[in-house]
Structures are given as structure tokens and as C-alpha cells.
């Protein structure tokens, strides 16, 4: 997996911090007992946020694990009555991005309301935080 993930303790904390309120859920795509895909969904009020999804699309191409990893949170959010499902990290609207093209096929439209940039110069980050926050 090429993405950077928090430590497993982070996910345990999400699951057990408030047992009465669901904060996150991990969805797994399995084939013959092997995990071939999965996704992580976060929940807040009436919105669900697809934080990460992925699948072994080359090895198990005909099983479509990446699509199933996205479909599971969509179905779950609908069944639980969430008003929205937002795909996180779909990329900038003016750059070519395969994942964005993929998620837009599920319907809806892209809105980049939660976007941040990080620069290697600390002074520039501090300055921009003062304007933004």
C-alpha cells in the first residue's frame, strides 16, 4: 500500500472512544479468505466520509475489488440513513486524477471545500494558517 496510514492504535481509538456513536468503519473485500481490497469510512452527524479505498486491481482484475471497496460504504451509508457520502482526496479539479474520474462515475459532483496545501517552508505554512484559520 502506497498511502501513509496512522498506527493501528489510531483506528482502535476511533472504534472504542465512544461506543454509542459510530465514528469509523473498516470495510474489507475478501476472496477465498484473502483480503483483496478495503476502505475506511468516517462518520459525522449526517455525513459519511470515504477516507481511503483500494483494491488489488491487477491481480484480481475480474473481481473488481476497488469498485467493491467503494460500493460497500455507499450501501452502508444509505442503509444507515446518512444524507451524504463524501469521497476524500479526489484531487484538484483542474489536474488529471484517475481516482476522481472513478468516483465521479458513482454520480454527484466534485466540490473542493476541504483543501489544504503544505509547503516545506515553515514560515510560509504559519503565514498561510493565519489567513486561512
For each predicted feature, which ranges?
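A conserved beta-strand-loop-helix scaffold within acyl/acetyltransferase catalytic domains
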Residues: 1-61, 75
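Conserved structured core elements
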Residues: 5, 66-67
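Alpha-helical elements of Rossmann-like donor-binding domains used by nucleotide-donor carbohydrate transfer enzymes
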Residues: 10-13, 68-72, 98-101
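Active-site-proximal structural scaffolding
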Residues: 20-22, 66, 96
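Short, contiguous acidic/charged loop-to-helix segments that flank catalytic cores in large enzymes
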Residues: 55-64, 90-94
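Gly/Ser/Thr-rich beta-alpha loop segments that engage phosphate groups in nucleotides
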Residues: 56, 68, 109-110
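Conserved acyl-CoA
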Residues: 68-84
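Active-site/acyl-donor-binding loops of N-acyltransferases
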Residues: 80-133
Amino acid at each position: 500500500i502506497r498511502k501513509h496510514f496512522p498506527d493501528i492504535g489510531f483506528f482502535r481509538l476511533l472504534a472504542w472512544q465512544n461506543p454509542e456513536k459510530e465514528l469509523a468503519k473498516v470495510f474489507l473485500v475478501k476472496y477465498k479468505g484473502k483480503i483483496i481490497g478495503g476502505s475506511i469510512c468516517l462518520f459525522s452527524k449526517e455525513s459519511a466520509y470515504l477516507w481511503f479505498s483500494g483494491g488489488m486491481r491487477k491481480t484480481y482484475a475480474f473481481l473488481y475489488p476497488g469498485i467493491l471497496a467503494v460500493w460497500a460504504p455507499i450501501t452502508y451509508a444509505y442503509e444507515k440513513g446518512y444524507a451524504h457520502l463524501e469521497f476524500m482526496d479526489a484531487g484538484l479539479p483542474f489536474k488529471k486524477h484517475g481516482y476522481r474520474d472513478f468516483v465521479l462515475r458513482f454520480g454527484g459532483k466534485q466540490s473542493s471545500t476541504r483543501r489544504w496545501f503544505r509547503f516545506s517552508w515553515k514560515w510560509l505554512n504559519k503565514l498561510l494558517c493565519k489567513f486561512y484559520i
